[in-house]
Amino acid sequence: YQKLIDIRTVPCVECAIYRESGIDLEFIDCGDDDEKGSMLSSLSLCASYRTKNNAKESYLVKTKTLNEILVEYNAPNFIDYISIDVEGAETDVLMSVDFGKYTFGYITIEFNNNCYLKSVIDNILTSNGYIFKQVNEFDIDYIHKSVNK
């Protein structure tokens, strides 16, 4: 985390974004595997990685909701762009957003080519005024109807 702070010029928030605040989530350190970094311990991918590679180090991270962070940093009600990549908890984050208070012009969400996850994301966003734009192997993009011209 300190390395991240050292190279950024924007605020860094030391927490995990989740559907509830104040929970301790366990993450495992995947060591030198730059592709995986750290993973939420409840993910099935993480469980298999832990077994296969004998990953031993884990740590707890306190959670905050996205709304809580937006309020804490006095975010405007309209945010041009947000990218959500939270290691399998994307739908948890989306379900906790107050879409009546915050509008995102364009949203990119990681879904790792998971059809079920894509369907849940689509239901949440389309019911809140977002229009599907594009998809690739890992991410799905939406634009808010107020900026789609």
Question: What do the PLM-derived regions correspond to, one by one?
Answer:
Residues 1-149:
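Phosphate/nucleotide-binding beta-alpha loop and adjacent structural elements of enzyme active sites
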